[in-house]
Design a protein with these regions (language model features):
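Short, Lys/Arg-enriched N-terminal segments with co-localized hydrophobic residues
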Residues: 16-30
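A polyanion-binding, active-site-adjacent surface
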Residues: 32-220
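N-terminal leader/targeting segments
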Residues: 2-5, 20-22
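Short intrinsically disordered, low-complexity coil segments enriched in acidic
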Residues: 1-3, 193-194
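Short intrinsically disordered terminal tails
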Residues: 26-28, 224-227
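Acidic, Ala/Val/Gly-enriched low-complexity intrinsically disordered segments
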Residues: 5, 9-11, 25
Length: 227
């Protein structure tokens, strides 16, 4: 293969990478701010073990993002593949939103900013929770890179506790049930993990009432961005 053709194919491949928004923002200033932020995160003593192992923080902050997804923390599969929501939970979430996998990863309309940008490890009953104070340190600076966010999807208790603060309800179920109180900016969700099928069976109102409204709100934002 000629060198020119080879390089063209490489560039095409890189352009399709879902994390290109972390590495090549449109606009030099934002690129510099993002690079500076990543360097600061990697230099933080709290993250020293990850940096030593060559593990980079896992988040996505496209400048033109309209929808922000705040979850718990990357799982081991996400950390190893460098691809967020790359599992059955991600498939379920995309189905709930009514978007394809390609659109989700390549449109730059979705930002993913978990409560911890690193896989926290395995506990006795699943993954460990996100580390304390991580979001307090880094979320404000990360969100400042994305001035056009219109919808923040809060997946799970940790994200809801942090962003809803005193407006959250007594538990996740009640918070999700009260989703209308947080619209149009916030939308609390149960985690789309297959492990939550029992919760959904016990709370049929979620699929019947909440998910249609959730998809409607997501599609409103997407359609507005296309105008």
């Amino acid at each position: 293969m000629r060198l020119g053709v080879f390089l063209h194919e490489v560039v095409k491949h890189l352009h399709k990478l879902p994390y290109r928004s972390m590495l090549s923002e449109k606009g030099g200033m934002n690129m510099t701010k993002l690079e500076e932020l990543i360097k600061k995160i990697e230099a933080d003593p709290q993250n020293a073990e990850y940096t030593k192992e060559g593990i980079a923080p896992l988040f996505s902050a496209p400048r033109k993002a309209k929808i922000l997804i705040v979850g718990q923390a990357p799982g081991i599969k996400a950390q190893e593949s460098r691809l967020f929501w790359n599992d059955q939970s991600g498939d379920n979430l995309r189905s709930w939103m009514g978007v394809t996998r390609d659109f989700f990863y390549q449109s730059d309309l979705f930002a993913v900013v978990p409560m911890d940008y690193y896989y926290p490890g395995k506990g006795k009953s699943g993954d460990l929770p996100p580390r304390k104070v991580f979001a307090e340190k880094w979320h404000e600076e990360t969100l400042a890179l994305m001035p056009d966010i219109e919808l923040i999807i809060l997946v799970g208790k940790y994200a809801q506790d942090y962003y809803l603060k005193e407006t959250k309800k007594k538990n996740l179920t009640e918070t999700v049930k009260a989703y209308k109180e947080y619209l149009p900016k916030m939308f609390p969700l149960v985690h789309p993990s297959p492990l939550n099928r029992r919760w959904m069976a016990k709370n049929p109102w979620f699929e019947k009432e909440v998910l249609p409204e959730f998809q409607k709100r997501v599609q409103e934002v997407i359609k507005g961005a296309k105008k």
